[in-house]
Amino acid sequence: MTDVKKSIRAGRGTELECLGWEQEAVLRMLRNNLDPEVAEKPEDLIVYGGIGKAARNWDAFHAIERSLKMLKDDETLLIQSGKPVGLFRTHSRAPRVLLANSVLVPKWADWEHFHDLEKKGLMMYGQMTAGSWIYIGSQGILQGTYETFAELARQHFGGSLKGTLTLTAGLGGMGGAQPLSVTMNDGVVIAVEADETRIDKRIETNYCDRKTASIDEALRWAEAARQAGEPLSIGLLGNAAEVHHELLNRGVHIDIVTDQTSAHDPLIGYIPAGYSLEEADRLRRDQPELYVRLSKQSMKKHVEAMLAFKKKGAVVFDYGNNIRQAAKDEGLADAFDFPGFVPAYIRPLFCEGKGPFRWAALSGDPEDIYRTDALLKELFPENQALHRWIDMAQKKVTFQGLPSRICWLGYGEREKMGLAINELVRNGELKAPIVIGRDHLDCGSVASPNRETEAMKDGSDAVGDWAVLNALINTASGASWVSFHHGGGVGMGYSLHAGMVAVADGSILAEQRLSRVLTSDPGMGIIRHADAGYEKAAQVAEEQDIMIPMKKER
């Protein structure tokens, strides 16, 4: 597999392998997901998030490549859990690819049934952006994580994390954004990770500053930085279920506690306490049922430590990996006594249609991204928080794979930025087209009662219709590719979510697509929250002339 691993890299420049730029964009982003700079285990087709994959197997991957190369401008390719299953003639304004990943009928929507289907070669776990081919490395979640810690700082620490110590765990593709997000907010963070290669990857990409296997050394570094008021991120090799209790026993003062281990998947994603990686691999292979049982017991112990830190005065929140649910299932009655990050810090942004707008340069030239950075500042001169974010990103973010950028934009802003990017492609200021997409974690694209839709005002946490409607409206609006997934972030049975990507190739057709998609997509977030009774969302809908047939009187 080593040769395959080395060979997967997105094309650059303006030479096409496909029959059009939309198809070429899909091919490049598929390959970009498996670039060794981007993916966690490219040799196994794993992009991030435990077993979040880009394709079901290598035969399916190569069949997708072949299909994309022959796909015409009026055809649509269908992907079922990472496998190409059909190609139909549609029309030029339809999506070029439609994807459904790991979607199970509700009664059967659990890990046991999923793994049974996976063993038979019938299904693949797509996570969120792994199976939808728009993952851009840890930067993809970076601004959302940064904004979460920034809001936490505003609520609890006077607007800055300077002089505070954060304790977290998990430095995979998503969790890897945590160290840099904390230091961008001037704080100190110890991030516990059981896999040393993951710590090394975050250090190589400048997301984490230092690593150690010694708790004593980590605490010395952290205290020195905290006392000096300097930001510092430390990757600590260890198991959170053990390390956290050791810190409690020592009476270490922690200001903030969260977690981004892959607790959503107790078999593949989480390492039980007391096991090395090698021992865990053997146990997983030989006794998977015992492994899951031990893994869940460790998660309970992990959450018990988080609750103990809360009792000692720390600000504690769940970062969307469903670890509270696992602990509750193991008998921990108060597992949900600390909130999830969305109701605590992010939902007000969702009510404005704000969410993770991202784009990647198909040219492969970083200068194309820097030009779009400048464009963003030109379009939104009054948004100083956005300017600060772009300045920090330019200084601190290392591109992984194709150069890309992430920023949170709201309703109206996304369309404005998308159309302006398309114009830069049209007039030749950019060397090649740009792909514009987002995380599935967005204002109107997810149903996830333990994460994005936790504690909705009207109790509609588990209503899955909204995620389906998001996929449908993006398809009707003509996104270049649209995806619908199950289980991302929080695991089987706990989420439904949709994604979209649109290609800015400078054409009039692209302009029309972008205008429709980048309006209706964030608009879904506004109508979803307005329907749930959020005053801010209803206000934005009224201000923006968004038609809601049965809008509630304000």
Swiss-Prot record:
State the signal peptide span: none
Q: Does the keyword Lyase apply?
A: yes
Q: Does the keyword Metal-binding apply?
A: no
Q: What does the UniProt keyword field contain?
A: Cytoplasm, Histidine metabolism, Lyase, NAD
> Cofactor(s) for this protein?
NAD(+)
Which pathway, per its entry? Amino-acid degradation; L-histidine degradation into L-glutamate; N-formimidoyl-L-glutamate from L-histidine: step 2/3
SUPFAM superfamilies linked: Urocanase
Task: Provide a Gene Ontology MF annotation, just one.
Answer: urocanate hydratase activity
Q: Which domain of life is it from?
A: Bacteria
Q: Name one GO biological process term.
A: L-histidine catabolic process to glutamate and formamide
One GO cellular-component annotation of the UniProt record comes to: cytoplasm
What does the entry list as the binding residues for NAD(+)?
49-50, 127, 173-175, 193, 198, 239-240, 260-264, 270-271, 319, 489
Comment on bound cofactor: Binds 1 NAD(+) per subunit.
Q: Where in the cell is it found?
A: Cytoplasm
Recorded catalytic activity of this chain's protein: 4-imidazolone-5-propanoate = trans-urocanate + H2O
Q: Name one Pfam family in it.
A: Urocanase_C
Q: Where is the active site?
A: C407
Task: State the protein's name.
Answer: Urocanate hydratase
Q: Which organism is it from?
A: Bacillus velezensis (strain DSM 23117 / BGSC 10A6 / LMG 26770 / FZB42) (Bacillus amyloliquefaciens subsp. plantarum)
